């Protein structure tokens, strides 16, 4: 089954993330994604982010940019990615890190989101780079 993505409109961003993550989105998930992105890429210096909804139930964010980013990760990956691939990578890292928390409902949501996003990333044009960065 092919997993597709659809941009979440400006009008629905807040309600969409609140429905999925509650207050954890603006307080924990969103800052984690931004911080991880800054740590992974010296080329990244802030951006407007698009929110994406996946046909399998997953969600992710990516910087709105046509630029490519040099990326290096703690697993010794070093390479170049599009903004979309960078966003997927940062969200996979964030979902993984946050899945070890104490609030069961939020951690379960992060676990499920990780798996849905990973499934989408398997067919991404930059799947090789994404998975070298994550694993």
Regions found by a protein language model. Name each.
Residues 2-13, 22, 99-135:
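Low-complexity intrinsically disordered segments
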Residues 7, 37-41, 74-81:
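Short, charged/polar micro-motifs that form catalytic or ligand-binding hotspots
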Residues 10, 30-33, 85, 110:
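A structural signal for well-ordered alpha-helical scaffolds and beta->alpha junctions
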Residues 14-28:
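Extreme N-terminus nucleophile/cap motif
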Residues 21, 37-41, 92, 99, ...:
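Hydrophobic, Leu/Ile/Phe/Ala-enriched alpha-helical segments that form helix-helix packing faces
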Residues 25-68:
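Amphipathic, interaction-prone secondary-structure segments
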